[in-house]
Amino acid sequence: MEEESGEELGLDRSTPKDFHFYHMDLYDSEDRLHLFPEENTRMRKVVQAEMANESRGAGDGKAQRDLQEEVDELVHLYGLEDDHELGDEFVDENIPRTGVSEYPPYMMKRRDPAREQRDWRLSGEAAEAEDLGFGGWGSAGQCQDLREAYRYTHGRASEEYECYVIPEEEDEEEAADVFCVTCKTPIRAFQKVFDEHKEHEVIPLNEALESAKDEIHKNMYKLEKQIIEMENFANHLEEVFITVEENFGKQEQNFESHYNEILETLAQKYEEKIQALGEKKKEKLEALYGQLVSCGENLDTCKELMETIEEMCHEEKVDFIKDAVAMADRLGKFLKTKTDVEISAQPEFEDQTLDFSDVEQLMGSINTIPAPSAPVINPQVPNSATGSSVRVCWSLYSDDTVESYQLSYRPVQDSSPGTDQAEFTVTVKETYCSVTNLVPNTQYEFWVTAHNRAGPSPSSERAVYMTAPSPPIIKTKEIRSCEEAVLICWESGNLNPVDSYTVELTQAESPEASGVTESVVGIPTCESVVQLQPGRSYIIYVRALNMGGPSVRSEPATVHTIGSYFRLNKDTCHPWLTISEDGLTAVRSERRTPARELSPSDTHFTRCVAVMGNLIPVRGHHYWEVEVDEHLDYRVGVAFADVRKQEDLGANCLSWCMRHTFASSRHKYEFLHNRTTPDIRITVPPKKIGILLDYEHSKLSFFNVDLSQHLYTFSCQLHEFVHPCFSLEKPGCLKVHNGISMPKHVTFY
């Protein structure tokens, strides 16, 4: 299609003053739709239909001329003078017209100036039927892809009619709705059928959008990961840079120190050699000087003798003979003297052999790293040990190079002198070591040395570490409980003392409390009273603690907070009584031999054949029952722990009891305290006696369990804790029932 420049030229011309331009956005789409009930109607068909309706008007000629002038001005305005076929479509001289009001004001749609001028699209079935086109603007088939150029609208502003030219804003291209996978570009759906994308793979645009977003997110994740890796690498490079500088400084300092040491050694050797050479020079010169002095003295003597002899030769004969004899003796003695004419000291010096072995050693040590300094061993971290292992840590100066460490340890010596403990060593690469196979609750002494090619470092200071204790052992037979608390006793399980103990308890058979563990910490002794909730079952553990850490849990013990539970105390038992294994039954057997008198004791009964029970020291309500034979003589009640063991129960102010005696088919009941009893008759002998100890109201009550009958109540002065007491005055047995709920009839007393 040819490129038209007339549109752009026409836009630059001045708009006639008789025409008013309105933007298409001033009209809603709904306002325009009702004017065009059929979309894509050919303009020629519309114009001819309207012109046919105008033929009935009387002023058709004038209106036709006015319209023609307006069309000409529009054509001139938009540079369409050369498009003759467009003018032919707008004007038909054979068709008369009525008023302009029959014609809606028309407008023209503009293309983007950067785009080519497209054909005017006259879509619709009428245009195809008449085979109409726009001449040079293209055929009807080509007009399918063109935009609509002109529309006619009409309106009445006043009694006179006016034609408006309303330019419409350029339409955006129709949005793409599919994505061509082959071309990797969004397209419209119909292009898949008719365009070059016919054989290409297409997917919905939303699917392509989600796929692109996922791909972008994956790439962003990869980029973030790569950024992190590069940042880490950059940090590592910075560390390497710093390390290179540090190592350079170390090597420079090492070289400088070694070379200075070598130079000092060489200077020292030079001084030593020069000094030795000077001493030899001095010796030679002294020897030569002595020899020179001796030679001079001999020479002077020779000259003197020569002069004397020459003088004698000039003397008279008599004088000559006299002097000659003396001179001959003197000359003979002189000549007999041996004159050393050999040089005593040679001028040459011996070749000096230089020993550079130590220098060579120093030179060889330039490339050798120095031995490390002594490591610094850290003190033990609390709660870091187990019963058989400890974790030992130490540190080293950063300037030292270490290839390995040697950790040594031994148990701390006890008080016995002369006992040497075996030492153990472990070689490790790290600055820590977990030492295993140790004895629980034992102190060990540790020290460490660092090693490299230059040798070992000095030993570090010695540090004492301690292993965790062994688990305690709960004394299940000594557990006492009531509805509000439990008394737990245990053995330490360790030879050495520990710092403290911890009691851990968990509710048993309680889904809502599953896994919840309560702890009582800082217990200094091997027993503890723990407050609990009534009517529950608990699983209890005990741990021992020291500086090294806690021990593992002890074996569990189960307690129930239902009533009061206790056992008979064998330490207070009279020798004639036998306590069952469960600690709830006391038996007195027949004795065939006469009983000998027992020595008094403050711990067990010696006169009254009795035994005490270990009741938990908790104030509140305590209830237990005693099963007896109705023909048995017995006493049951309570007493203070320091009650006199040489007296019967109820015979003093420290005990309260119910006494039953059977004689001559008669039952006698007494409620004794300080040897006094009220006058009470009991008609039905009880086989099971219920006893209620009420600390809150300082009362002690007795009941006939089978009849739910109240027997008697003491008002006591309970300034301390009391314990149950049981006495058999004749052979027989009684059984204690405890750990049971308090009956309802007991609560009224």
Curated annotation (Swiss-Prot):
Residues 205-317 form a coiled coil. Keywords: Coiled coil, Cytoplasm, Nucleus, Repeat, Sarcoplasmic reticulum. The keyword Ribonucleoprotein does not apply. It holds the Pfam family fn3. Residues 546-744 form the B30.2/SPRY domain. InterPro entries: B30.2/SPRY, B30.2/SPRY_sf, Butyrophylin_SPRY, ConA-like_dom_sf, E3_ligase_FN3/SPRY, FN3_dom, FN3_sf, Ig-like_fold. It is found in: Nucleus; Sarcoplasmic reticulum; Cytoplasm, Perinuclear region. One of its GO terms (cellular component) is nucleus. Residues 375-470, 471-564 form the Fibronectin type-III domain. PANTHER family: E3 UBIQUITIN-PROTEIN LIGASE TRIM36-RELATED, FIBRONECTIN TYPE III AND SPRY DOMAIN-CONTAINING PROTEIN 2. Interacts with CMYA5. In cardiac muscles, identified in a complex composed of FSD2, CMYA5 and RYR2. This is Fibronectin type III and SPRY domain-containing protein 2. It comes from Homo sapiens.
